[in-house]
């Protein structure tokens, strides 16, 4: 697969990625007995949300990407730099550490830069949502990258509702399922560490399906985080996957997250890059 296919993979991946207090009640008592406070047992999704990774920044300098698009694949080194609620930069450096492709996610938009061909695509989240038929926001993409449970376009508190059901996936994990809007969600949670192991997002009707798996969890300081992430997206038009190896992660340190200047690049469209 030629390196100019990398930008097509990166473009489709941008479409994919864009996409608790204790509850207490009082029991009635008879006579003069004092009222007892009963704490409602937390669901596994509540406990998982409380234990989910939380950090202000992350730097992955030795990331390894295995990319596949329309049955063609390529491997590339790269980096990931993120400042929470501000920006995430994914850089691909397939040749001698030279950056050829870049994906920038900010609350305002998504920027895909093909440095090899000196062109770029700038997309709003509304455009991305229309492309994948799923409501995507920056917060959703950020939560996916932070290995958190995501209900597209909504708060995680939706997972506290009775509509979210839990069942044993195997002896070591539990599956939490919920349907919101036109999307079916399934999350597999480790029973011991409460880490998110897999998330499936399936659009009803003719929509696509995205799956994100997280594995190789290690403790980096006080942050439990996966060292391997695999993202797949499949629909009638796209078949794309990306495996990311993250052997060296630094949390809550300084991050170089300066945006690229695209004034000397040619603006193009996502369809041009994908064709």
Protein language model features and the residues they cover:
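N-terminal leader/targeting segments and the immediate start of mature chains
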Residues: 21-73, 271-275
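C-terminal motif of bacterial Sec signal peptides marking the signal peptidase cleavage site
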Residues: 16-19
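Bacterial N-terminal signal peptides that target proteins for export
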Residues: 1-9
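An acidic-aromatic
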Residues: 87-139
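Gly/Pro-enriched, hydrophobic low-complexity segments
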Residues: 157-267, 272
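Flexible, processing/modification-adjacent segments and terminal tails
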Residues: 116-184, 264
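Extended beta-sheet lipid-handling architectures
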Residues: 58-62, 75-77, 91, 105-107, ...
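Beta-strand-dominated lipid-handling architectures at cellular/organellar boundaries
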Residues: 73-79, 86, 100, 117, ...
């Amino acid at each position: 697969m030629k390196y100019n296919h990398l930008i097509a993979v990166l473009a489709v991946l941008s479409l994919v990625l864009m996409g608790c207090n204790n509850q207490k009640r009082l029991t009635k008592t008879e006579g003069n007995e004092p009222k007892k406070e009963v704490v409602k047992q937390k669901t596994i999704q509540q406990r998982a949300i409380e234990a989910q990774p939380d950090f202000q920044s992350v730097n992955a300098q030795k990331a390894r990407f295995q990319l596949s698009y329309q049955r063609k694949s390529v491997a590339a080194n790269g980096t990931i730099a993120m400042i929470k609620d501000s920006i995430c930069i994914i850089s691909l450096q397939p040749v001698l550490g030279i950056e050829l492709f870049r994906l920038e996610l900010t609350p305002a938009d998504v920027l895909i830069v093909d440095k090899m061909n000196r062109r770029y695509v700038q997309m709003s989240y509304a455009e991305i949502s229309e492309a994948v038929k799923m409501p995507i926001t920056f917060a959703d993409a950020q939560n996916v990258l932070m290995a958190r449970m995501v209900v597209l376009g909504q708060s995680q508190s939706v997972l506290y509702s009775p509509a979210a059901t839990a069942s044993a996936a195997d002896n070591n994990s539990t599956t939490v399922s919920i349907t919101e809007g036109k999307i079916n969600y399934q999350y597999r949670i480790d029973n011991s560490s409460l880490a998110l192991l897999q998330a499936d997002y399936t659009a009803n009707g003719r929509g696509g399906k995205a799956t994100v798996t997280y594995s190789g969890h290690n403790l980096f300081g006080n942050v439990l985080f996966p060292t391997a992430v695999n993202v797949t997206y499949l629909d009638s038009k796209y078949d794309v996957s990306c495996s990311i190896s993250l052997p060296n992660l630094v949390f809550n340190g300084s991050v170089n997250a300066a945006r690229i200047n695209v004034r000397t690049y040619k603006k193009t469209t996502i369809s041009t890059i994908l064709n």
